[in-house]
Amino acid sequence: MTWAGLLIALVGALGYALGAALQQYEAVAEGASLKLVRRPRWWIGGAIGFAGACLHAVALSLAPLVVVQPISVATLVFAVPLAAFMYGRKPYRAEILGSLAVAVGLLWLMLLVPEHNVTPHLGNGAALGLLAVIGVIVLVTQVAAGRMSGAGRAIVLAIGAGVVTASVSTFVRVVGGGLEGDWGRLVHWFTLAVPVLLVCAVVLLQRSYAVGYFGIAYAGVQVIDPITSVLAGALLLGEPLPTAPGTAVPALLAAALTIGGTITLGRLAPDHTRPVVPANPAAPIEATAGSGSTVTAASDAS
């Protein structure tokens, strides 16, 4: 069942990448506001992304969290070119190299985590503790983003979106993996938490996309989501982490590759769908000369 889960996760992740590219294009055009609900392309992107998320949920019910999560990382190399295509341009070399570095580094890092396929169990106290920690992280990132701009703002908002997305994956893993043929187990507040957290994740994602730095925003979510999921799986669900001494050097190299790719993406210029208006545009003024003749001059910003 693990291989079936991996294949389903791959298809779902590709759909999620396409949906993200479509929604980011609209979020840059309209901003992270209610205006987005009037944009058909934003809804199409949302539907495709939702289908991808549903497939991801199915995959989580068939395979461990630490096995499924790394699959979504590889879609970064597809999402960035798709976003570039939306703006009618070819992807920059730095975008491709940065995306590959992040994807390879994070996938390498995740593959160091040993496989452990057992029925997940999460107590109410631990679940509430997880939500409290996620809430604090989101609050801190939102406050910090309000004082930042550019790539820094995009990555900080992506961190908040990533941890919420990871919480969705954790609850889906617990609900789906714990069914064991008993559908009555769906009657639990964990099941209700999934759509609520999913809506929060979507809102936070749109805020991150709206900054215009799709590469760094998407990469940020792709990095934070699986790392947070693996930590949650290890701390709350009893899933193992790599402890062998031989994994230390590979883990450091993988982390360096991931960080280097993220920095590369952060240095790229943002994409815009609206022309940039100069800060002090020259506005014509009218001056009367002689008997009613009009002379037009450019205003002096100084």
Where are these regions (language model features)?
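Polytopic alpha-helical membrane proteins, predominantly small-molecule transporters/carriers
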Residues: 1-302
